[in-house]
Amino acid sequence: MSGDFFFGVFLFLLLRWLALLFNLLAFPRLRPRPTPPKPTASLLVPARNEAENLKRTLPALLRQGALEVLVLGGLAEDGTAQAALEAAGNPPACRLLRGAPPPPGWTGKNWACFQLAQEARGEVLVFTDADVLWEEGALGGLLE
């Protein structure tokens, strides 16, 4: 191999190195955007005759990190309210609402959801049924 070949390779590598050095010094660095705060969420559960489901669902809901978990189960006939209290263990983030009978023209679940929405304090209202099992971090993914 001739000296011209090695000189050409050396010159090529030198130019590539200088281009890399120029790019490192001349191009601006991108800064990560500050992440906006996540909105507060209220998990709302209209429950009627859902005592067995609440025993499984409520602990998973409480682990989601919501501002509050509201359960409306006042008109149930199977001890839904008592099951909710036992499953929750009475944490401050969980409230049980008794509810009122629906006025004329309202159906049961619509009226229950309306009452829950009136009591909720979160910026985002997330309605869920008592038989839905939430995976860890599901609420965080929903709010992103």
Residue ranges and their predicted role:
Residues 45-59, 75:
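Active-site beta-to-alpha loop of glycosyltransferases that engages the nucleotide-sugar donor
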